[in-house]
Amino acid sequence: MKRIISLFLVVLCIGGVTVFAKGAVTVSSECDISDINVPLDNTPVNAAIGQTLDIKAKSAVLMEPNTGRVLYENNPDEKLPPASITKIMSLLLVMEAIDRGDLSLETVITASEHAASMGGSQIWLEPGETMTVNDLLKASVIASANDACTALAEAVAGSEEGFVALMNERAAELGMTNTHFKNCTGLDAEGHLTSAYDVAVMSSALIKHTLIKDYTTVWMDSLRDGKSELVNTNKLVR
């Protein structure tokens, strides 16, 4: 059963962010996943999952990552603002760029004025500051840093606008019919929406890149020769 719930946990681990705009997908700390008996056929298992997990989200999906089989769903197609869960798609495109050889973990990126201007969660990049892809990934995943994520986006596509176009193209390729991205970070923007089902789909694509687990499983790290601490607020990785 650990394999079956892996995607659900990965969705929670990305960037230490567990929320849509107005509702967290939570796992009760007292639940025993081993008590869930999942049929081998396509029999719905919503009842069994619902009795075991304390789910308080407006929408939720539990998907088996290898087959795409949905084990539990609640309003799976409702369009909601994804906040920093947006970074799942951003990270997927960065992983794919690394696989293509367009970037490496040692590639040095110079922060633009635009990247440094991002609000919300950030590592306070200065315009002209340089940082490796590896460090920007750490900042994006562990601290959900919007400036770091934007710097990566610009390195992949030349601009955030160009990167967002790639995000929407990739979403369409994955069949994410309830998703439209307006930025790479998840900062509030009208029409920037996705659904629980689409989050599961893009998460399934992301975790096929084993490199991402080097970042999503980290509790604490640092940047700038130890001068800037990174702490993952997700208690599941502590």
Residue ranges and their predicted role:
Residues 1, 173-180, 188-238:
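Domain-terminus/edge residues, biased toward the C-terminal soluble/receptor-binding domains
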Residues 22-197, 204-207:
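Active-site-adjacent loops and short helices of periplasmic peptidoglycan-processing enzymes
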